[in-house]
Amino acid sequence: MSKKCQVTGKKPITGHNVSHANNKTKRRFLPNIRTVRVTLPDGTKKKIKVSAKGLRILKKKNFQVDL
């Protein structure tokens, strides 16, 4: 399953977990992705994966969003 926002293009990035002893282990920072149903201007409905920021963008552009 893809972890990429279809509106903003956000995707996972890599980094480290850092312990108190300063040991580092690799980890992934995942975007906050949700599947929502969007009503397009022509009246059709489509399911897309969006991040929290992408959801705000869709609402500001007056798309009908069903969670």
UniProtKB/Swiss-Prot annotation:
UniProt-listed GO biological process terms: translation
Domain of life: Bacteria
Keyword Ribosomal protein included in the entry's annotation: yes
Entry's transmembrane regions: none
GO cellular component, one term: ribonucleoprotein complex
Membership in a protein family: Belongs to the bacterial ribosomal protein bL28 family.
Protein name listed in UniProt: Large ribosomal subunit protein bL28
Origin organism lineage: Bacteria, Pseudomonadati, Campylobacterota, Epsilonproteobacteria, Nautiliales
